[in-house]
Amino acid sequence: MTVPHFLTLFDLPADEIRQLVRRAIDLKALQRQGKIYEPLKNQVLGMLFEKSSTRTRVSFEVGMIQLGGNAVFLSPRDTQLGRGEPLEDTARVLSRMVDCLMVRTFSHSMLEHFSAYSQVPVINALTDSYHPCQLLADIQTYFEHRGDIQGRTVAWIGDGNNMCQSYINAACQFDFQLHIATPAGYGPDPAILQMARERVQIIAEPREAVRGADLVVTDVWTSMGQEKEKHRRLQDLADYQVNGELMSLAKRDALFMHCLPAHRGEEVSAEVIDGPQSVVWDEAENRLHAQKALLEKLLIGGPL
């Protein structure tokens, strides 16, 4: 039997990933009502971190606990990976001891290699190429505030990084238009763009990209592992800050999202991220609920 992994948004059919978002909304409501729902009793999630994170660790760990299961945190110092054990051996061993594996790492090809040797589902909790769990939370947040995102326009401003590339995938899976504004040399992977030609436009000027948008999204200009490039990146991306002037060109009821952590005064101004159009705190919380829906789907096939 094929093991169901979740490495990109394309690992689930469009109708199932849409159902997953709606299920996340239902699970959030259950929790708010104080109802106990523990379908994952006696199941264990192994959490393998090469890149540190606040939101990823807490949301997955709390999510498993709320669903009745448990989670085990593993950093490179906690495994033999840090001492040269082959990746495939680690995958084989861990997948005999836990029911699901969540991996947050740098190389997407490494994650693909790891998952090929795992006997249990592997979840991409972030690679340098994609961040699909965050997109589940983002789409859930849009659904909650504005309804279905199908047919809407999303503007991505800034670095064409893993979040941008996951938005490209989301444009295909959720059927919306995506405008991407990045400086020269900072665009997303052309091969990823090629898959979504009908739904994605590259627009050099940020003002044109956000004009009429329903949702404006950005991310940090310097990702983990790029610290040596920070000074150059700040200069190159200086004209791509999401501020009040830029947001005024989007629709009057447009939302602003950022996966956090944010750097006020760099990729976004304080007036925007702390303003009335910002839904970043709901977006952050929804990592918990979206990932609970994902764990339920991968481990038991859906709601009991």
UniProtKB/Swiss-Prot annotation:
Keyword Oxidoreductase attributed: no
Record-listed L-ornithine binding positions: N162, D219, S223, M224
GO biological process terms, semicolon-separated: arginine biosynthetic process via ornithine; citrulline biosynthetic process; L-arginine biosynthetic process
Gene3D superfamilies registered for this protein in UniProt: Aspartate/ornithine carbamoyltransferase (3.40.50.1370)
The protein's Enzyme Commission number: 2.1.3.3
Keywords: Amino-acid biosynthesis, Arginine biosynthesis, Cytoplasm, Transferase
Pfam families for the chain: OTCace, OTCace_N
Residues given in the record as carbamoyl phosphate binding sites: S53, T54, R55, T56, Q80, R104, H131, P132, C133, Q134, C259, L260, R287
SUPFAM superfamilies membership: Aspartate/ornithine carbamoyltransferase
Any GO MF annotation of the entry: amino acid binding
InterPro entries the UniProt entry points to: Asp/Orn_carbamoyltranf_P-bd (IPR006132), Asp/Orn_carbamoylTrfase (IPR006130), Asp/Orn_carbamoylTrfase_sf (IPR036901), Asp_carbamoyltransf_Asp/Orn-bd (IPR006131), Orn/put_carbamltrans (IPR002292), OTCase_ArgI (IPR024904)
Recorded catalytic activity of this chain's protein: carbamoyl phosphate + L-ornithine = L-citrulline + phosphate + H(+)
Record's subcellular location: Cytoplasm
Protein's pathway: Amino-acid biosynthesis; L-arginine biosynthesis; L-arginine from L-ornithine and carbamoyl phosphate: step 1/3
GO CC field: cytoplasm
Translocase recorded as keyword: no
Family note: Belongs to the aspartate/ornithine carbamoyltransferase superfamily. OTCase family.
Purpose: Reversibly catalyzes the transfer of the carbamoyl group from carbamoyl phosphate (CP) to the N(epsilon) atom of ornithine (ORN) to produce L-citrulline.
Protein name: Ornithine carbamoyltransferase
Organism: Nitrosococcus oceani (strain ATCC 19707 / BCRC 17464 / JCM 30415 / NCIMB 11848 / C-107)
Species lineage: Bacteria, Pseudomonadati, Pseudomonadota, Gammaproteobacteria, Chromatiales
